[in-house]
């Protein structure tokens, strides 16, 4: 049986009897993927677009499968002169993230936002200095990026310190 790859992160499932004497390399690579899922990465943005790859569209053996989009917590850095649209690829890869927009202004017209997209579906805009928890549905060309905390249902909320609600600080 030939090796196959998981659809989420391209983790290689070694076929029965394959890779005799070499399976350790594949296993270590798979462990590197799992480590990224539980880790943090700062990603420097520049210009007005960036592609954040979750996994290769057609994964193969080797470290070329390791992608920045495998990290679940990503801090966007870099000096922007305009809003930056980050495309999460491929559009068939479902994923979730915690993002921070820690970019700076390269001129005097900012601060600038990071716009997250995966397909023609919904997009999310993260304002400068803000964080978001999002998920990508991986629905192909119509894929959407969704704010996981929109319409948040909370039974009881306790706030210590100031709270800003609809622009009013209490």
Where do the model's predicted regions map?
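Intrinsic low-complexity, repeat-rich intrinsically disordered segments enriched
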Residues: 41, 45-51, 117, 122, ...
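Glycine-rich, flexible loop motifs
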Residues: 50-83, 93
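Acidic, glycine/polar-enriched metal-coordinating patches/loops
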Residues: 2-9, 77-154
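Generic, well-ordered alpha-helical segments
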Residues: 19, 27, 66-68, 80, ...
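Extracellular receptor-binding modules and their adjoining Ser/Thr/Gly/Asp/Asn-rich linkers
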Residues: 30-45, 130-145, 164
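Extracellular "spike/adhesin" assembly and maturation modules
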Residues: 1-63
């Amino acid at each position: 049986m030939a090796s196959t790859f998981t659809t989420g992160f391209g983790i290689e499932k070694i076929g029965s009897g394959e890779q005799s004497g070499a399976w350790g390399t594949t296993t270590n690579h798979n462990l590197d993927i799992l480590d990224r899922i539980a880790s943090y990465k700062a990603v420097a943005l520049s210009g007005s677009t960036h592609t954040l790859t979750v996994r290769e569209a057609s994964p193969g053996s080797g470290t070329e499968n390791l992608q920045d989009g495998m990290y679940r917590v990503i801090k966007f850095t870099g000096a922007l002169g305009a809003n930056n649209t980050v495309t999460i690829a491929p559009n068939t890869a479902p994923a979730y993230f915690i993002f921070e927009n820690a970019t700076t202004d390269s001129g005097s017209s900012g601060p600038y936002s990071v716009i997250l997209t995966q397909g023609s579906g919904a997009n999310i805009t993260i304002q400068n200095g803000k964080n978001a928890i999002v998920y990508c549905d991986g629905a192909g060309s119509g894929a959407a990026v969704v704010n996981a905390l929109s319409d948040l249902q909370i039974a009881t909320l306790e706030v210590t310190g100031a709270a800003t609600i609809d622009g009013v600080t209490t």
